[in-house]
């Protein structure tokens, strides 16, 4: 309602919303409206509300904005103003020139006569002349500088301590426009001066002591509501370990029925007296001297359900369960390791051979593993190796592995002693035939190997082309799907 009224150009609507009258400067001072003008606005709002309620035809347009609205919506917005409680408050406006308060008279720099009334005592104060506000005035400082009637207010306050000035009346009038009018815009400029003059009687932003003001439906007593919250339980909930929430039986722990003095000192738990749920923190054991244990004999349904769902605690606890810290957990979640792999094997498994563009990835750890098995030390004891080997005099150690050289077999034929020329000639021909046969077989084997290598290379090239064609086909399908084609 106030957002809708704030867009008006009439005097009454802008006084209700406490908005500046000139749109060229939105930071101007709000108008200080007194009780007579508020009564006029009240009568106007009541007459308008009654006319809307008793009208049988459809209400076509919003009188403020010219926007079509229903009757129910207009009535709801008018009911938000709480007109009944505002109108029923006793008022005794004194006849003063402030009843015909002109807008041009206020903004042209002319002084305006304003009258006020104490809302609690029902006594009228004297009318005084209010100086018009100018853009150079600092109206938010709350001081009496620039206000010629400040000394007069101080004299009236000294004579009548309970009596408030018209600015206090203005604050009180604006606080009754609705229950949600706690904005700083509605605070009086002389609020700090009134607080200093009244002394012990504390006045809040609504113009009356907090103990005399009734809380509205839009407000909440924070101090009263915060007492119902178990802040200690929330701290344990936010600071507990993640493992506690995985195991509910460790989080909700029932206190034993019989508690001795020694057990109460050892198994002291922080719990809430209202909820009957004790919160157990596995990381930090609470000291028994500062946190006494509470009796958990609660009849609430939540605590009974927890007692049924959680396992029963032992009658007496002699020793506390060992607390597992984070630095004690040095194993993986999958379980302990059976063997520790070598660092080179771990990192070499990720080394992969690549061809030119897009080829098959072949792990390079298989050949290395076979060679590493040969280089590993055997299961034979050290003293047996020293006894059987010819190099037993060398300083053998567990980290020393002798290098293994490949032994080549000596090729050739052992020439027999010559017998005669015919026998030597036949042996020479046999050796020549054997060499030719071996060369022939070696050439055939080499040819087969080269042919196999050519076939393998051709197959690898064909696989690369196949993958490239598949990628091109998939990209073409995506383009066709973007254009809206249906592809099976």
Curated annotation (Swiss-Prot):
Keywords assigned: Cytoplasm, DNA-binding, Immunity, Innate immunity, Isopeptide bond, Mitochondrion, Nucleus, Transcription, Transcription regulation, Transit peptide, Unfolded protein response
Region entry Disordered, spans: 138-191, 353-400
InterPro entries the UniProt entry points to: bZIP
Subcellular location(s) of the protein: Mitochondrion matrix; Cytoplasm; Nucleus
Top-level taxon: Eukaryota
Gene3D superfamilies assigned to the protein according to its UniProt record, in alphabetical order: 1.20.5.170
Protein name listed in UniProt: Stress activated transcription factor atfs-1
Organism for this UniProt entry: Caenorhabditis elegans
Lineage per the UniProt record: Eukaryota, Metazoa, Ecdysozoa, Nematoda, Chromadorea
Gene that this sequence comes from: atfs-1
């Amino acid at each position: 309602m106030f957002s809708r009224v704030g867009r008006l150009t009439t005097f009454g609507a802008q006084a209700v919303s406490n908005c500046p009258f000139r749109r060229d400067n939105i930071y101007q001072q709000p108008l200080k409206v007194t009780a007579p003008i508020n009564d006029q606005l009240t009568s106007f709002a009541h007459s308008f509300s009654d006319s809307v309620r008793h009208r049988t035809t459809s209400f076509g347009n919003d009188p403020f904005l010219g926007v079509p609205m229903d009757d129910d919506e207009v009535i709801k917005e008018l009911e938000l103003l709480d007109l009944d409680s505002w109108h029923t408050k006793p008022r005794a406006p004194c006849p003063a020139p402030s009843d015909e308060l002109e807008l041009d008279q206020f903004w042209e720099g002319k002084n305006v006569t304003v009258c006020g009334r104490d809302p609690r005592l029902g006594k009228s104060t004297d009318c005084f002349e209010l100086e018009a506000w100018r853009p150079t005035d600092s109206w938010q400082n709350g001081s009496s500088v620039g206000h010629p009637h400040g000394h007069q207010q101080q004299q009236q306050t000294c004579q009548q301590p309970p009596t408030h000035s018209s600015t206090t009346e203005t604050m009180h009038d604006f606080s009754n426009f609705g229950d949600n009018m706690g904005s700083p815009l509605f605070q009086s400029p002389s609020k700090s001066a009134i607080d200093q003059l009244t002394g012990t009687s504390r006045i809040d932003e609504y113009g009356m002591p907090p103990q005399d003001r009734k809380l509205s439906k839009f407000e909440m007593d924070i101090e009263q509501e915060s007492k119902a919250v178990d802040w200690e339980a929330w701290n344990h909930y936010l600071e507990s370990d993640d493992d506690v929430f995985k195991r509910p039986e460790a989080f909700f722990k029932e206190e034993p029925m019989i508690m001795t003095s020694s057990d109460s000192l050892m198994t002291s738990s922080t719990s809430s007296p209202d909820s009957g749920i004790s919160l157990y923190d596995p990381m930090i054991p609470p000291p028994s001297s500062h946190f006494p244990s509470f009796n958990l004999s609660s009849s609430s349904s939540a605590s009974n359900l927890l007692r049924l769902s959680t396992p029963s605690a032992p009658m007496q606890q002699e020793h506390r369960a060992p607390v597992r810290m984070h630095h004690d957990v040095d194993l993986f979640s999958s379980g302990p390791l059976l063997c520790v792999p070598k660092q080179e094997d771990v990192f070499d498994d990720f080394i992969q051979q690549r061809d030119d563009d897009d080829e098959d990835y072949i792990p390079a750890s298989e050949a290395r593993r076979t060679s590493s098995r040969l280089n590993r030390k055997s299961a034979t004891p050290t003293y047996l190796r020293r006894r059987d080997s010819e190099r037993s005099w060398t300083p053998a150690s567990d980290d020393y592995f002798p290098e293994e050289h490949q032994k080549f077999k000596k090729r050739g034929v052992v020439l027999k002693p010559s017998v005669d020329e015919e026998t030597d000639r036949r042996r020479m021909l046999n050796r020549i035939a054997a060499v030719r046969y071996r060369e022939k077989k070696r050439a055939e084997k080499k040819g087969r190997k080269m042919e196999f290598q050519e076939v393998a290379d051709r197959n690898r090239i064909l696989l690369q082309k196949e993958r490239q064609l598949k990628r091109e086909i998939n990209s073409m399908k995506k383009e066709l799907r973007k254009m809206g084609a249906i592809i099976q």
